[in-house]
């Protein structure tokens, strides 16, 4: 999603259609509040940036293909699929194999970060994959002003916990749940309304002459194309044909 947003902003004339599948907010991941995507400060405060769970990083480094809760298999299943969805073992093995090819470190995944004395204890850095999602680097809300205006199909899963208005990867949500201590409260640091921010930018796009459709797959989480493949293909065909 983040790549598609950016490509559309940079090269709108090359697009005939744009399909956004469970896209990242056009204001980046973390570090903003409200549907207008206001940053807390220029440092990207509130965004995890290049920080990742140390236990997950350890399991990646060990090439762990097992069932440990912090190993690639379990993390992929929790992040991509709705609870209880029957994951095909062969496909799951393929996803795990591909994830374990990732390069680790400050120049790769997750990147570097700056420690912080107060909540949320980290600030985004300047290197690596995850920092590319921080709001000071990833703001593509200019999409609302692109011209020409390719039609947009936005597909999201109703059970998505990765890109959501209550994302389990949002430091504010983790603070509310007590996973990250010292949460200052919802008034000071509310969860990022990722879905609301996407809709707000697409509504601006519509006001500027574009058009979009929002489709919610009720039985899907982050991977609607895998969880409801028949409907997904039908919707794509109809969108391209229309």
Where are these regions (language model features)?
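Conserved hydrolase catalytic core segment
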Residues: 1-38
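Short catalytic/ligand-binding loop motif for oxyanion handling, primarily in non-cytosolic enzymes
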Residues: 2-4, 26-29, 161-164, 222-225
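Core-facing hydrophobic residues within beta-strands of well-ordered domains
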Residues: 15-16, 211-212, 220
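A structural motif corresponding to the C-terminal end of an alpha-helix
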Residues: 144-148, 201-214
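Catalytic histidine-centered segment of alpha/beta-hydrolase-like enzymes
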Residues: 180-190, 217-229, 233
């Amino acid at each position: 999603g983040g790549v598609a947003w950016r490509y559309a902003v940079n090269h709108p004339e090359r697009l005939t259609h744009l399909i956004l599948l469970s896209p990242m907010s056009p204001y980046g991941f973390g570090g903003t509040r409200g549907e207008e995507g206001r940053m807390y400060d220029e440092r990207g405060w509130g965004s995890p940036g290049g920080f990742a769970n140390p236990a997950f990083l350890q399991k990646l480094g060990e090439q762990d293909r097992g069932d440990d809760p912090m190993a690639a298999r379990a993390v992929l299943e929790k992040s991509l699929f709705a609870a209880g969805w029957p994951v095909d073992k062969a496909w799951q093995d393929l996803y795990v194999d591909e994830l374990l090819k990732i390069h680790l470190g400050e120049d790769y995944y997750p990147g570097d970060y700056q420690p912080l004395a107060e909540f949320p204890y980290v600030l985004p850095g300047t290197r690596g994959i995850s920092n590319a999602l921080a709001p000071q680097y990833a703001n593509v809300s200019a999409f609302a002003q692109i011209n020409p205006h390719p039609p947009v199909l936005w597909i999201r899963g109703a059970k998505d916990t990765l890109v959501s208005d209550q994302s389990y990867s949002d430091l504010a949500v983790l603070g509310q749940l007590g996973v990250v201590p010292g949460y200052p409260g919802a008034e000071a640091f509310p969860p990022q309304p990722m879905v609301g921010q996407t809709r707000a930018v697409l509504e601006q796009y519509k006001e500027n002459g574009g058009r979009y459709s929002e489709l919610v797959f009720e039985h899907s989480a982050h991977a609607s194309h895998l969880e409801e493949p028949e409907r997904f293909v039908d919707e794509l065909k109809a969108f391209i044909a229309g």
